[in-house]
Design a protein with these regions (language model features):
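Conserved, well-structured functional cores that handle cations and Mg-NTP chemistry
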Residues: 1-36, 41-44, 216-219
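Short, conserved catalytic/metal-binding motifs centered on acidic residues
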Residues: 2, 20, 33-41, 56, ...
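Solvent-exposed alpha-helices and their adjacent loops that cap or buttress functional pockets
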Residues: 26-28, 48-51, 124, 139-143
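Phosphate- and divalent-cation-binding pockets in alpha/beta enzyme and binding domains
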Residues: 44-45, 66
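Short, surface-exposed basic-aromatic patches at helix termini and helix-loop junctions that form
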Residues: 46-54, 76
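An anionic, glycine-rich sequence signature occurring as long contiguous blocks
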Residues: 61-166
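Short amphipathic alpha-helical "interface-anchor" segments enriched in bulky aromatics
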Residues: 155-190
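A short, flexible helix-boundary coil/loop motif
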Residues: 178-242
Length: 242
């Protein structure tokens, strides 16, 4: 729904790894499934999510070399010759449109079957599932294939894991695209002091209000323009703060 629930400034001499725990502390996560970019695949972050009675689905890349190596090796062996005898779940979706076919396939393995093959298993609180997601995009003149690996605290349900990974990228694309198109965020040159964070906060508040206002049958960009020249509509937008 493109709502922004929280925001934390990343210090100039730091990165998102230190900012994410601060953000998790201020959010009510109970009962939710949390997805984060690969930088957020950290044992401390996974522990915080579980401690708040939530679940996680986290991408595993080479910033976690042992974890990435073990998971990729497990799925490679399963794909080639079933050297490791592990039950797994699988789910596939096929979408057609805009001149292409997108096939997404997910395989998941439950912890009871992989924990002896994962050297860092005990470091990840709540870890129940490892997953491999393959995205195949078929265009008129070429085929693109991308493979990603994940750890998850949810049970080994390939459909649920695949849905979580798709939802994550949907939020990324919709939110960032709207902020860029409707608010021209990428063109902002505000750098001094807390200016960048302050303006980002204002953009997020405005986006939340415009997203919640449902009477105007147009996109966020046009809603923003309408609020600028129509005071009656502006009051409708502001009334969504309640």
């Amino acid at each position: 729904n493109r709502l922004v629930l929280g925001q934390v400034k990343v210090d100039d001499k730091s990165n998102e790894i230190t900012a994410i725990p601060q953000l998790l502390k201020v959010l009510d996560l109970k009962g939710s499934t949390v997805t984060i970019d690969a930088m957020g695949c950290q044992t401390k972050i996974a522990e915080m999510i579980i401690d708040q009675e939530a679940d996680y689905v986290l991408p595993v890349k080479k910033n976690q070399p042992r974890l990435h190596g073990d998971i990729s090796a497990i799925f490679a062996q399963l794909e080639t010759d079933n050297v490791i005898d592990m039950p797994y779940d699988t789910h596939q979706t096929i979408n057609k449109g805009h001149g292409r076919i997108e096939i997404r396939t997910c395989w998941t393995i439950a912890s009871a079957h992989f924990q002896d093959h994962l050297r860092t298993f005990t470091a990840w609180k709540g870890l129940n599932t490892i997953a491999m997601v393959r995205r195949e995009r078929r265009l008129a003149d070429k085929i693109e294939v991308e493979t990603g690996y994940y750890i998850a605290s949810i049970e080994s349900d390939a459909a649920q894991v695949l849905d979580a990974t798709r939802s994550h990228w949907g939020v990324e694309n919709k939110l960032h695209w709207v902020l860029d198109i409707a608010f021209r965020e990428d063109e902002s040159r505000t750098r001094k002091g807390n200016g960048a964070q302050n303006f980002a906060t204002l953009r997020h508040i405005a986006l939340n209000l415009l997203s919640r206002e449902k009477t105007a049958k147009c996109g966020i960009k046009n809603k923003r323009l309408k609020a600028g020249w129509d005071e009656a509509y502006l009051l409708k937008v502001l009334s969504c703060m309640g």
